């Protein structure tokens, strides 16, 4: 009888004691398979976690069996706001319950039979870990990539910290609030550490080309960087001795510019708004300020308001109105655009909405509807008429530069990265200041001091500012004050995949710039497969790629990119098809599933639900079906153990061996392609075949079936191997298939009696009815069933079915 609790507990203990998943160091073939490490929340694992973790585990187990040295680690992204807020509300220090949460997560992960090497475990709150985070920051500072700047930030007084745009939401009343806690957020100028990621924009774009990522994922990164090469052009103001600089990527359409649109934040707004429009513009800007940059850029409906002023088109001297648009960002380009409604979809909709002129300046050979967005030849463009779009771009850019109207430039949407948080629970900066605010880098580790009161202040000072004993120190006779801000949660996750490589079994780390580190990085980098949620598709990957490319540039790592292949698993939804949440009451607890049905059942079910990258609904009956299938597998093996089925030659050998060899080949292909659901389907088909036959030619078939099964259901597989007196999976190799069985000219005949399947037999293709019938009559089971019966009719379907109707 299949007792999952007994079997799973037994094998988890054996694996733990024997360090079965220790990182190999014997092969010249390596495979580094990585999960996006979790934030250890108090609620523990949810059923979404095992989906990605099981996928990487299957690959890790497969590669070990294929003779690879495998690095498959796990760790904890344990700094950050959630733990700190909980600590403040309960009056505790966040470290204590963070460690408790980690212990819970670790126990749950081990209960799933995941083959992590926990000697490689990392924790971002470990001083030995963040000492190296601090080292990277110091190197960034030395190269001018970490700077202090007075900038506008999203300030949340209640949380007492600056928030990234991604951490700010708009509530139902249109007000900015924090994602965590829904507290009010305002714009405030503060001095912050900033990392100059924009210096790496081109390198980050170039690096995408050679990566094995989905195009959609690459596109997300490209769009976030947002590189545009175009032309800056000055439009003189009609009534002021000033000009507005616009940025356009389509200079060839400038004769069709019928109005300008500027950002509500543009510095010229106050000067150019006429008195009769002031109040309306003021109200418009007030609504605009409620949005963050992401919401401004993503707005479907584009709104605007006329300033009352005009600019002069420098190419045709025509007077055109200046509008303010809520879709124009000051942070991109110049904060002003020339609007060409005949050749831009957004401008076309805007012009129709507000009754503005639409002037076509590009045509193609065919009649086209406006807006026409493709290239063609110029019309209504003075001496440039008749030029192709390509020729016009070159000529118009020459004209712009020759007449001092502007220049060709490249702009990026990417902004430099605000890297400070006014909170306690984060990595301290290895920085101090003297009385004149000169910066001093601190050698070695700056450890986060234990504090009872970690509540943030309302004035922007970090809680660390109140720890005077820690705050001040002397160096070389100078009194210095430590930086009291801490790094954001991103800091540790930027480089943790390197920390796994550096981690030693005794808990220490090799230094990032050591010779031993270089040797290890040469072996293990890049990460071969990285699996995690879609929510990290932009920022985490972009920030990690930035730090990695920097470390490459200073000679620390041997590869330009950290992650060769990235896969975003789909979301597991509730039984109602909705995202799981406490408020909907549709959360599934994986620990309860493991207890009731077993870890192997959960693993196989989550892989069988559908393609790894698709969203999938949880189905209670389906997971019970997987449990029944595992019971069926266990019972099948027992039938061979107790003699109900036997290991000996039979007429069905060729069929069994061809399907067995086909199974090995196909599972190998499916696993390499991450098609785990179809791989499991093939295992199910093979089990059905073994149930239909009474004999198989070799124990090797059962042994290797168990080895294949171990990728998906490792506990039951180990148990079955042990019952066959076979070695543990860690001491086995992946089975090979015999290609001669895959090139067979055989076909399977289903032999039926009165429509019921009684045997499945291999025959050479295109045998006659008489030949098939003669062979069928030699099968012992068929002979027995036909005793004292008369065949009154034979139904024959060539290469498929022989059905004997008897009385």
UniProtKB/Swiss-Prot annotation:
GO biological process terms, semicolon-separated: leucyl-tRNA aminoacylation
Span of the annotated motif 'HIGH' region: 38-49
SUPFAM superfamilies: Anticodon-binding domain of a subclass of class I aminoacyl-tRNA synthetases, Nucleotidylyl transferase, ValRS/IleRS/LeuRS editing domain
Keyword Cytoplasm among record annotations: yes
Top EC class of this enzyme: ligase
Binding site for ATP: 582
Keyword annotations of the record: Aminoacyl-tRNA synthetase, ATP-binding, Cytoplasm, Ligase, Nucleotide-binding, Protein biosynthesis
Gene3D superfamilies: 3.10.20.590, HUPs (3.40.50.620), Isoleucyl-tRNA Synthetase, Domain 1 (1.10.730.10)
A GO term for molecular function: aminoacyl-tRNA deacylase activity
Residue positions of motif 'KMSKS' region: 579-583
Entry's EC annotation: 6.1.1.4
Protein family per UniProt: Belongs to the class-I aminoacyl-tRNA synthetase family.
NCBIfam families: leuS_bact
Protein name, UniProt field: Leucine--tRNA ligase
Organism: Mycoplasmopsis pulmonis (strain UAB CTIP) (Mycoplasma pulmonis)
Taxonomic placement: Bacteria, Bacillati, Mycoplasmatota, Mycoplasmoidales, Metamycoplasmataceae
């Amino acid at each position: 009888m299949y007792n999952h609790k007994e079997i799973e507990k037994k094998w988890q203990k054996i694996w733990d004691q024997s360090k079965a998943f220790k990182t190999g160091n014997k092969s010249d073939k390596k495979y580094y398979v990585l999960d996006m490490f979790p934030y250890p929340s108090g609620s523990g694992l949810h059923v979404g976690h095992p989906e990605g973790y099981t996928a990487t585990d299957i690959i890790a187990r497969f590669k070990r069996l294929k003779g690879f040295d495998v690095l498959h680690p796990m760790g904890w992204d344990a700094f950050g706001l959630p733990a700190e807020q909980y600590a403040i509300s309960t009056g505790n220090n966040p470290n204590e319950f963070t460690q408790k949460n980690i212990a819970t997560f670790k126990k749950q992960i081990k209960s799933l039979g995941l083959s992590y090497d926990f000697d490689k475990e990392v924790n971002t709150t470990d001083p030995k870990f963040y000492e190296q985070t601090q080292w990277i920051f110091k190197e960034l500072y030395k190269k001018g990539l970490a700077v202090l700047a007075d900038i506008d930030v999203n300030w949340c007084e209640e949380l007492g910290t600056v928030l990234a745009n991604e951490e700010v939401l708009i509530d139902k009343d249109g007000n900015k609030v924090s994602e965590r806690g829904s507290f009010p957020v305002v714009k405030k100028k503060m001095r912050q550490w900033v990392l100059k990621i924009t210096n790496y924009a081109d390198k980050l774009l170039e690096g995408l080309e050679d990566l094995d990522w989905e195009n959609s994922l690459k596109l997300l990164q490209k769009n976030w960087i947002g590189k545009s090469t175009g032309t800056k052009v000055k439009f003189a103001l009609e009534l002021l001795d000033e000009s507005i600089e616009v940025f356009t990527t389509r200079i060839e359409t400038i004769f069709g510019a019928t109005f300008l649109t500027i950002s509500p934040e543009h510095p010229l707004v106050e000067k150019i708004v006429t008195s009769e429009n002031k109040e309306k513009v003021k109200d418009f800007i007030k609504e605009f300020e409620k949005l963050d940059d992401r919401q401004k850029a993503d707005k479907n409906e584009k709104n605007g308001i006329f300033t009352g002023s005009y600019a002069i088109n420098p190419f045709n001297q025509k007077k055109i109105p200046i509008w303010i648009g809520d879709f124009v960002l000051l942070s991109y380009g110049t904060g002003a655009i020339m609007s060409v409604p005949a050749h831009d979809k957004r401008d076309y909709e805007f012009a129709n909405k507000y009754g503005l002129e639409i002037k076509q300046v590009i045509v193609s050979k065919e009649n086209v509807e406006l807006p026409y967005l493709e290239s063609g030849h110029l019309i209504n463009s003075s001496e440039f008429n008749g030029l192709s779009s390509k020729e016009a771009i070159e000529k118009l850019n020459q004209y712009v530069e020759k007449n001092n109207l502007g220049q060709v430039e490249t702009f990026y949407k990417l902004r430099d990265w605000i890297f400070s948080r006014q909170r306690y629970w984060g990595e301290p900066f290895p920085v101090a200041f003297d009385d004149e605010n000169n910066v001093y880098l601190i050698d070695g580790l700056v450890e986060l001091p234990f504090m009872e009161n970690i509540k943030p202040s309302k004035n922007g000072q970090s809680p660390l500012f109140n720890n005077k004993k820690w705050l001040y120190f002397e160096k070389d006779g100078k009194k210095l004050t430590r930086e009291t801000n801490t790094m954001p949660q991103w800091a540790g996750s930027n480089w943790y995949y390197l920390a796994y490589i550096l981690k030693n079994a005794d808990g220490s780390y090799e230094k990032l710039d050591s010779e031993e580190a270089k040797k290890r990085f040469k072996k293990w980098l890049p990460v071969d497969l990285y699996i995690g949620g879609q929510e990290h598709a932009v920022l985490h990957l972009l920030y990690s790629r930035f730090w990695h490319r920097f470390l490459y540039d200073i000679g620390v790592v041997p590869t330009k990119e950290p992650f060769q292949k990235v896969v975003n698993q789909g979301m597991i939804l509730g039984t109602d098809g909705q995202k799981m949440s406490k408020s909907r009451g549709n959360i599934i607890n994986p620990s309860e599933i493991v207890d009731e049905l077993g870890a192997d059942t959960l693993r196989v079910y989550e892989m069988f639900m559908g393609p790894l990258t698709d969203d999938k609904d949880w189905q209670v009956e389906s997971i019970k079906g997987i449990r029944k299938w595992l019971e069926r597998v266990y019972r099948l093996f027992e039938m061979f153990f107790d003699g109900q089925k036997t290991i000996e030659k039979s007429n069905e050998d060729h069929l069994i061996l061809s399907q067995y060899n086909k199974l090995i080949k196909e599972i190998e292909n499916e696993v390499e392609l991450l098609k785990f659901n179809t791989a499991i389907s093939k295992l199910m088909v093979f089990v059905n075949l073994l149930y239909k036959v009474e004999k198989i030619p070799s124990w090797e078939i059962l042994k290797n079936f168990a080895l294949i099964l171990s990728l998906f259901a490792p506990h039951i597989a180990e148990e079955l191997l042990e019952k066959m007196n076979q070695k543990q999976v860690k001491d086995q190799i992946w089975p090979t298939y015999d290609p001669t069985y895959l090139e067979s000219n055989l076909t399977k005949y289903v032999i039926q009696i009165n429509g019921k399947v009684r045997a499945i037999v291999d025959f050479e293709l295109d045998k006659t009815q008489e030949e098939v019938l003669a062979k069928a009559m030699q099968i012992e089971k068929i002979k027995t069933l036909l005793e004292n019966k008369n065949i009154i009719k034979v139904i024959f379907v060539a290469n498929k079915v022989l059905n004997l109707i008897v009385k």
